[in-house]
Every structure is written in structure tokens, then in C-alpha cells.
Design a protein with these regions (language model features):
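A catalytic-pocket lid/entrance helix-loop region that shapes and gates access to the active site
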Residues: 232-299, 404-406, 410-414, 423-443, ...
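Short, surface-exposed "cap/lid" segments of acyl-processing enzymes
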Residues: 95-183
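Gly/Ala-rich beta-loop-alpha elbow adjacent to hydrolase catalytic centers
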Residues: 216-225
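Small-residue-enriched hydrophobic alpha-helices in membranes
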Residues: 616-796
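Alpha/beta-hydrolase-fold enzymes
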Residues: 2-82, 205, 209, 226-341, ...
Length: 796
């Protein structure tokens, strides 16, 4: 009886929280709607202020002005509908000739995945550089994996200012993982992962003298890249993961604003069974147009009005850009039933990709902790498809602490844009020239970072030539700090998703038992093709094309308009201002509808699944208590590191000295990283020649020792340098750095000078090098990234 009363009280509490949340969201939606109308009205009134004797409203009533505006509207209407006709013609032509990548660059086939032992509809192509661009084959190659989420490949190389364009301009060889419309029979996501591993190995073979290829994964391609790197860590270089939903249950919680409506979709639809039903209706193939429709439903104002009104308002100049983007947006690809079921069960609903439960073809689990290369995570606060929490929370899920990241030798760098939307992360030219270009410029430096969790910051400034320049810096963070900052409610909002998973499993099983046999019996290729052709997104394209005989007049009419376009009507007139005002009102109304829809969806989700979770778990469903603040020295990785304090040799001693001399809590500017790289080349003879992942593990272990037992770390340093030659070598390196003008210009801190004196005192020599009073061992360099030996870290 007590349990029942507790559950009832808990349900009442949930109901109260949901009601308050809905009220806040509704109030915010109303406020934003009212503000947009007020702003639009203010602009209209402002434009009404007379610049001459005649007020704007009087000008608007002038018959001649009305005639000119009517001509303008008529001409823009013809151009607008003709653009949609051209879009439809392009769609029909693509369907007839086969969908192709929308890559802006020429390309040549390297591997056709359809001819592999386990065939897949993927291929590896090499991008051809544009005229005037010279490729340096010794530079690190890039492999870009685009999302297979309904659309076709190529968005990462959509134009000059793109991820591919940035890498090509920098002289790198760029390879693209493309895919074809139809999946191979029986193809699975695990087959795709195995094929992508072969692609990367081929790139390594083609560039034997280059660093390991950088893998760039966009959205779905991001978690595909993570699977690839965890299954084959020896062939992958740095990973750049852009807007990838790695922890799908997580969500953003801005004050009173719903940022993540997509994460509720699986629960509101009852789980994974609907994806299976849709694939069965498609005769075993899932139509990617359904995924694109979900994206469009996220922002009805843009999908139904804004993008079309922008085309209508700028009918003279906008069509080329509109058609170029629609060529990608309107190309719909297919998946096998097995593929979409794997995605929904393991990612969208199951959220098990990070847990190690998912296994590859060889039976080995995809353990993301096995990734040896640095990982750069790029997300945006303006992304309502993959908010930063979904992009970053997996780090806290698989690493128990900052110490585990360091002990495993992992480098993880986070970069957050303040406003760009999901597609803008991959498509925006501004993002390509700023974020992606800067990421490409620092990959080699990031590879030589000591293990840990870093934030990357890009500051704009005006260069000496007047052009925009960027300053890049890094700052190290604690995992615990970042997890607390990102998750306001300590992730208690993720608990109802466990109930979603259980309901999904029940519904999936019920569908497979009672409905699936009947659906498969009645489905065939003819019915599947009919469904695809009459999907609303396809139908709206081919219906407005030359296939429609009622539009035969439109092409010639548009040509006539273009030939005698009335240029003077382009000017802003009062009637155009009224037009803009009406458009803004309609757009604001659609945004208000979206905000209320998302708020009610969120409330319904937590009302149902929150209570269901409470009933199922009982006392366990109470809010997660804050983790007890125990002694960090009790953590396994800390205990192991401290126990090995006196073990090791020159490599461990150099790493420990780097930790002892490191600057604490200061940003790490790019200029300092460049200095380290220069010093590494000049003093390579003093640096251990280790693979990068091995050095980072050594570096991480020594940093744990220095963090928790700094005095013992210094006192036991002589144990690591029992060999007099090693001791002399370390001190000789310090002397050479002292004499280096580049190091002297950097300037050590007082704390570093003091620590350097202590290190010297702890390492007496019979023949001691001349002692200086100026310390510069804080600039002990990084080894070249290809071999990656140490620097004495941020000692710079």
C-alpha cells in the first residue's frame, strides 16, 4: 500500500512539473509571436515615415504605383512557378538517369563497394582538385563520410566553400564515401562498416608516406566514422564528427524553450515498429523520403512558406541557388529493412551505440574507448536535430572520469557554434571558411596534445590586409565540469526513455507476430514503387514539371518575362513593404504553431512515459541523487597510476617533467602549438620515438601522478632516471632549450622557474651542465605528429 501511495505521489509530482513546463513553453511561444508581430509592424510604420512631402500610404494608393506593383507580382509569379517547374524537371531527369552525388568537384572511382565480397551500395571516390589547386601527396589525406539519412551524398563537397573545398585548397588529397540509391540485397549496417574500413585501408595504401587519414563524419556519417575507428583504430587518423547524435536520449534545456523535439518522435510513435512497417510496405526497402519529411516537419515555417517566399521575393537572382540546393534535398535514397531497423533499435530508441553492446561482423564490440586517434566534436546551440548534449554526452557515458580519459591516452576536443542550424554545420559557406578551415589547420597540433578534454575557441579579428582573420586557442576542461554544465537536470529527463525502449520492444514483437506476415504477403515491388512515386515530397516535384501538360505555357512565358523584365519594379515600394509584412505575419504564425506543437508533444511524452517509468521502477524512479564526492584516489585508473610511480625510464621521466612544468588553467593559443611543432623537429634526437597513442597513454598516466601526488612525483623522478646517461640527456635537453631564442621569447612563469630548479636539484650529476637562472624547459617540444613523441606539454 505504501508503494502504491508513493507511486501516486510521484505521478502527481510529474504531472505538476509537466503542467508548469507546458505553461512556460506556451508563454514563451506567445511572447515570441507577439514580439515578431510587433517588430514587423514597427518596420512597416518606420517605412511609412515620409522622406518627401508625400507619405508612403499616399504613394501606395497611387494608381500608377499599384499598376507597377501588379506587373511586378505577375512577373515574379511567372518566374517563381517556372523555377518550381525547373526543379521538377531536374527531379524527373535524376530519377531517369539515376541519382548521383551532388559533388561540386570532379571525381574518379577508387573502390566500388558493390563488387566487394560482401557487396554494399557504397563507393570510394577521389576528388579532383579545381584549376589552380596543387595537391601535396605527402600531406594527410581526408576521407569524408556524408549522412545516409534520406538524402544522397555530396553535401560535404557541395560547393567551393565546403569541407572538401577547404581541404583541397590546403593541398590535401580528399576522398569521399558516396552511396547509390538502391541498397544491395541483404546489405546491413555492419557490412557498410566493414566496407568503409576497406576504403580507409586503401587510402592508407595510396599514401604510404603520409600521416593516417583524417575521417570527417557528418550527422549519421559521424557515428559511422566512430564505428569505423573503433573497429579499426590502427588505420584511422583524427576524427572530425559534425552534428552526430551519439547520445540520442539526451536533450538541450534552454530556459523555457524546447530545443530537441526529434528525440521524442520514437516514443510518440510507439517505438521501432513503424520503421519496420514502412520497410515492409516498401517490399523490404525503407524510403528515405520519410526521413526527409521528418526534417521538413521540424520547421513548417521554412518548409511551407519561408523558402518559397524568399524565392518569390528574389525571383531574379535566387533560382540558381534554390535549384542547386533542391537538387540534393530532393534526391531520396533507400535503405534495406535490416538497416533502418538496426538504426532505430540501436540508436534512436535503444541508444546502445556507446554502451559496447553493439558488435561487428567478427563479434567484437564497438568500444569507443578503443579509438586511438584524437576526436573533434563539432555541434551547435542552434541545432534542434542534434543539440550539443547528443553530440557530447556519450563521452561522460563511456568514460567514468577525467582520469580515465587521460589514462587511456584519449584526446577529445569540443567546438560549439552559437547559432547555426543542423544543415548549416555541413552546408554553410561561412562555417566552412571559419570552423572547418580552422579545424583542418590544427589537426596535426591536436594529434600531439597530451590526453584530456579540450575546448576549441575561434576568435575573429581584422587582419593587416583588412580581411577577416581567426585566432584559435584551446583550453583544457574536466569531464565532470562539462557534463554538469551541459545537463541542467543531471540527465534525469533521460529516464523515461528507458520506458520508451521497453514499450518499443513490446510493440515490435507484437507487430512481428500479428501484422508483419499480412503486410509482407500483400506487398510487392509494384505497390512499393507506387507508394514511393506518390509520396508527397516526390509528387510535388514531378507534378510541377514538363510531365504536366497544363504547364506547357510556363517555360515560354518565363523566357518572355526574363527578356523584358521591368527593372524599375525591383525597388522597395510601400506595397512591397506590405507584402513583406504579410509574409512575416504568416511565418510567425507557423512558428507559433510549431512551438505549441512541440510543447504539447513534449508534455504528452513526459506525462505518459514519465509515469510509466515511475510505475515500472518504483523507488528507483526517484530523481537521481548527486554522486557522492568520494576520494578520487580510489578510482581504479588513479590507483594504478600512483602504484606505478617509480616504474619506467626516460620516456616516463620526460612526460612527468612536462606535467610538472605545465601551465595550469591558461588557454593554449595556436602560436604556442606551432612553436612546439618547430621545436620537436629541431630536438627530435632527445624525444622518444613512439606512436602517438602510446605516448598519450604515458603522458596521461604521468599527469594523474602529478595531479594527485605532486611532491612524490618530483621526489621519485630520479627513480625513472637511474641511468646517468638518461639523466644527462634530460638535463642537456633543458640546457639547449634555455639557449633557444624562440623559447626565451615565450617567457616562463615564476612557478615554472621554481619547478625547474627543483627538477635540477633532484637530478644531481657528477658532471653537471652549467646551471642557469633562466628556466625554459617549459618549452620542451612535441615530437613530430607522425611519430608523436612528447613535448613537456602546455609548459609553453
Amino acid at each position: 500500500m505504501t508503494d502504491l501511495a508513493n507511486q501516486y505521489a510521484r505521478c502527481q509530482e510529474i504531472g505538476g512539473k509537466v503542467a508548469r513546463l507546458l505553461a512556460r513553453r506556451s508563454e514563451l511561444a506567445q511572447t515570441q509571436f507577439s514580439q515578431r508581430l510587433a517588430d514587423a509592424t514597427g518596420r512597416l510604420v518606420e517605412s511609412d515615415k515620409p522622406a518627401s512631402a508625400s507619405p508612403a500610404w499616399a504613394t501606395a494608393l497611387d494608381p500608377w504605383a499599384g499598376y507597377r506593383y501588379a506587373v511586378d507580382v505577375a512577373e515574379r509569379s511567372v518566374l517563381f512557378w517556372d523555377t518550381l517547374r525547373q526543379r521538377g524537371n531536374g527531379f524527373v531527369e535524376q530519377a531517369r538517369n539515376g541519382l548521383r552525388p551532388v559533388l561540386h568537384f570532379g571525381h574518379e572511382l577508387v573502390i566500388d563497394g558493390r563488387k566487394l565480397a560482401r557487396p554494399v551500395n557504397y563507393a570510394l571516390v577521389r576528388l579532383l582538385p579545381p584549376d589552380g589547386v596543387v595537391i601535396d601527396v605527402s600531406k594527410r589525406p581526408y576521407v569524408i563520410i556524408d549522412p545516409r539519412a534520406g538524402h544522397g551524398p555530396g553535401i560535404g563537397g557541395f560547393k567551393d566553400d565546403s569541407q572538401a573545398g577547404v581541404a583541397l585548397k590546403a593541398g590535401h588529397s580528399v576522398y569521399f564515401v558516396i552511396f547509390f540509391r538502391d541498397p544491395e540485397p541483404g546489405q546491413t549496417l555492419l557490412d557498410v562498416c566493414a566496407a568503409e574500413a576497406q576504403f580507409v585501408k586503401k587510402v592508407c595504401e595510396l599514401h604510404p608516406d603520409s600521416p593516417k587519414p583524417a575521417i570527417v563524419g557528418n550527422c549519421q556519417g559521424g557515428w559511422a566514422a566512430m564505428m569505423l575507428a573503433s573497429s579499426d583504430p590502427d588505420h584511422t587518423g583524427p576524427l572530425v564528427i559534425n552534428g552526430a547524435p551519439m547520445s540520442y536520449w539526451s536533450g538541450a534545456w534552454s530556459e523555457g524553450e524546447g530545443d530537441n523535439p526529434m528525440r521524442y518522435s520514437g516514443g510518440m510513435l510507439g517505438g521501432t515498429w513503424l520503421a519496420s512497417l514502412t520497410a515492409d510496405l516498401g517490399n523490404g526497402k525503407f524510403d528515405g523520403a520519410h526521413l526527409v519529411q521528418n526534417f521538413e516537419n521540424l520547421n513548417p515555417a521554412n518548409s511551407l512558406w519561408d523558402k518559397y517566399y524568399h524565392l518569390f521575393d528574389n525571383a531574379d537572382i535566387e533560382p540558381p541557388r534554390f535549384l542547386d540546393f533542391e537538387r540534393w534535398w530532393g534526391g531520396y535514397y533507400l535503405m534495406n529493412r535490416e538497416e533502418i531497423e538496426w538504426i532505430t533499435r540501436n540508436l534512436f530508441v535503444g541508444n546502445t551505440l556507446w554502451s559496447g553492446e553493439v558488435r561487428g561482423l567478427n563479434g567484437t564490440a564497438f568500444d569507443l574507448r578503443e579509438i586511438k586517434s584524437p576526436i573533434i566534436l563539432f555541434a551547435s546551440l542552434g541545432d534542434n536535430i542534434t543539440p550539443p548534449q547528443q553530440a557530447f554526452n556519450w563521452v561522460a557515458d563511456i568514460y567514468g572520469s577525467t582520469e580515465e580519459i587521460k589514462a587511456r591516452g584519449q584526446v577529445i576536443v569540443g567546438l560549439v557554434h552559437q547559432s547555426i542550424g543542423h544543415l548549416g554545420i555541413f552546408v554553410s559557406g561561412k562555417v566552412a571558411k571559419k570552423e572547418h578551415q580552422q579545424i583542418a589547420s590544427v589537426l596535426e597540433a591536436i594529434e600531439a596534445f597530451p590526453p584530456g578534454l579540450y575546448g576549441m575557441e575561434i576568435a575573429e579579428r581584422r587582419g593587416e590586409d583588412g580581411e577577416t582573420a581567426y585566432d584559435v586557442s584551446f583550453r583544457e576542461y574536466r569531464l565532470e565540469e562539462i557534463a554538469a554544465r551541459l545537463n541542467r537536470f543531471e540527465r534525469s529527463d533521460e529516464q523515461p526513455f528507458e520506458a520508451v525502449k521497453r514499450v518499443s520492444e513490446l510493440n515490435q514483437r507484437a507487430y512481428e507476430l500479428f501484422l508483419q506476415p499480412w503486410v509482407r504477403m500483400w506487398s510487392n515491388e509494384t505497390t512499393a514503387n507506387l507508394q514511393r512515386q506518390f509520396h508527397p515530397l516526390r509528387a510535388q516535384r514531378w507534378a510541377l514539371s514538363d510531365l504536366n501538360p497544363w504547364l506547357a505555357w510556363l517555360g515560354p512565358a518565363a523566357e518572355a518575362v526574363r527578356a523584358k523584365r521591368h527593372a524599375e519594379v525591383h525597388e522597395e515600394t510601400p506595397l512591397r513593404e506590405f507584402e513583406h509584412y504579410g509574409s512575416e505575419m504568416f511565418s510567425a504564425s507557423l512558428d507559433f504553431y510549431r512551438a505549441m506543437r512541440d510543447a504539447m508533444t513534449e508534455s504528452a511524452f513526459f506525462s505518459f512515459y514519465g509515469n510509466l517509468y515511475t510505475v515500472e521502477r518504483g523507488e528507483e524512479a526517484q530523481a537521481r541523487p548527486a554522486a557522492a564526492a568520494g576520494d578520487p584516489r580510489d578510482l581504479p585508473y588513479v590507483r594504478d597510476a600512483l602504484a606505478s610511480m617509480t616504474e619506467g625510464g626516460y620516456t616516463e621521466a620526460l612526460a612527468r617533467a612536462a606535467c610538472l612544468l605545465a601551465r595550469r588553467g591558461e588557454p593554449l593559443p595556436l602560436a604556442r602549438l606551432a612553436l612546439r611543432h618547430e621545436l620537436a623537429k629541431d630536438y627530435a634526437a632527445y624525444l622518444p620515438q613512439l606512436p602517438g597513442d602510446q605516448w598519450r597513454r604515458v603522458r596521461g598516466e604521468q599527469e594523474i601522478i602529478v595531479r594527485y601526488e605532486p611532491e612524490q612525483a618530483l621526489a621519485t623522478l630520479p627513480h625513472l632516471l637511474a641511468d646517468p646517461q638518461d639523466r644527462e640527456k634530460l638535463l642537456e635537453l633543458a640546457e639547449k632549450l634555455l639557449d633557444d631564442k624562440r623559447v626565451q621569447e615565450a617567457g616562463p612563469t615564476a612557478a615554472q622557474l621554481s619547478m625547474l630548479d627543483k627538477i635540477r636539484s633532484s637530478l644531481p650529476l657528477e658532471r653537471t651542465p652549467a646551471v642557469r637562472t633562466v628556466g625554459a624547459m617549459h618549452e620542451v617540444p612535441e615530437a613530430p605528429a607522425a611519430r608523436v613523441a612528447p613535448d613537456l606539454k602546455e609548459a609553453s
